[in-house]
Amino acid sequence: MPNNLQHQEGSYSLRSSNDVSPADDWTQTNDPKEKKRIQNRVAQRTYRNRIRARLEELENKIRCHEKASKQDGNENEDRASEKAMAQDFLITDQALQSLTLPRRVSSAGLSQEPATPPDLLLPSFFHQQQVKIPSAADELNQPKPPSSPPAWAEGQLNVAPRAAQARSIAPTSTGMHQISPSYGPPVFLPTEDLSIDIISSRGLSSSWKTAADLTVQGTHPLPAFPSCSLANIESPSPASSQATDPMDMTFHTATEANTAILPGHRSSLDERLEYVLERAEQVGFDNFDSLVTAYYSETFHGSSRLASEQRLSRNRRLPRVIAEIFRAASHWSAWERGGMNQEVIKSAECLLISEGTAARNALEGSLSLLVDGGNGSGDASSVERLVQNEIPNLWALMTSLASGTHSPRQQDRSGTALAAIMLLYFSGSMPKEQLLRLLIICLPDPVSPQKNN
């Protein structure tokens, strides 16, 4: 039985690549998307085959039950005369109604394993639990309760009018009455001190026989019969009870398929990144770019771990990420890197303009005092320090640009960068004579070749 269970549990998992056709062998392709499509196609085909086989099995069971019910109907017609004899016997035995102690009934003739499905249900005082036979057709056919209460409570013996649908009771030569069910061996009860109340009930389908309630009374206590307990009723095997829920199979198939394609740390970079992109879309992000944007731009709770990671990443990891991306962009096509370069230039423009707007007034007043107060190298150093403190980003940019076009005759290009900044900021807002004196201070004298020699 455990081997069967293990086989059944694994029957809904993704089939091995050795069991599929060459067209469905996902190990022969390197494309992750194509591999996933092949695996999903194989899993769906396997699931449909399992459902189709299960439906055929259920249809066969229903046909067997219908055939058995038709045969049982023919047997009931033959036993109609025997039912009449049993009714006469029960009516003449009315004196037993006053007895309160049930008579012990021998279980020697009872079958230990009644066949399924039974057409006779014993009442609750005959055994402590209601006998219920689980089967695959229970969902389609549920028996209704008896149409009328028995005459047991009114002190009368009653035999239901549908005696043809109950079990046959016939006297035997040994003084015992035989109850002949349609399934299983006969059951013998003593002829003395016997009262039976048979109640017919209707089922929802012709595949089930009419149920009857059997009440036995006598002068001795009635023990619990092994054949009447739930433990001895034939029930579906564990394998059949766990096998056939289509929704359950769908869930296991989808889960196992997703688990089978879950990439690990040894998987290729393409598979891992594709998995991350899919998970980001599943949790509500439009794409991976929106996830990264939200991580760096949103404001999280100050004491959360996410906020701490965000602050560290902004200061340490994000600059390296931008540098690596810009370095890798040199290998992109012109169309791919065009948009990024434009955004970099726009961002630099916004940064430098906002920096210069805030420092313009302070620079103009300080530089006017320096120009009017004197000249010389000392004044140039003062102007350079002032510019570095007020507009550091523009100073770094202009110095880098000037150093990239340096002349072998002039090693220090800071004066050129400083003069360019003065022209950029104060051309048109400062008097021309004052601006020329400022440029003379900023630009150093060129070194002649004779002096170098």
Swiss-Prot record:
GO molecular function, one term: DNA-binding transcription factor activity
Sequence ranges assigned to domain bZIP in this UniProt record: 30-62
The keyword rRNA-binding appears for this protein: no
Keywords, alphabetical: DNA-binding, Nucleus, Transcription, Transcription regulation
Chain segments carrying region Leucine-zipper: 51-58
InterPro entries xrefs: bZIP, bZIP_sf, Sec_Metab_Biosynth_Reg
Inactivation phenotype: Completely abolishes the production of radicicol.
Polar residues: bias regions: 1-30, 170-181
Subcellular compartments: Nucleus
Domain of life: Eukaryota
Region (Basic motif): 33-50
UniProt GO cellular component terms: nucleus
UniProt region (Disordered), positions on chain: 1-45, 160-184
Family assignment from sequence similarity: Belongs to the bZIP family.
Function: Transcription factor that positively regulates the expression of the gene clusters that mediate the biosynthesis of pestheic acid, a diphenyl ether which is a biosynthetic precursor of the unique chloropupukeananes.
Protein name per the record: Transcription factor radR
Native organism: Floropilus chiversii (Chaetomium chiversii)
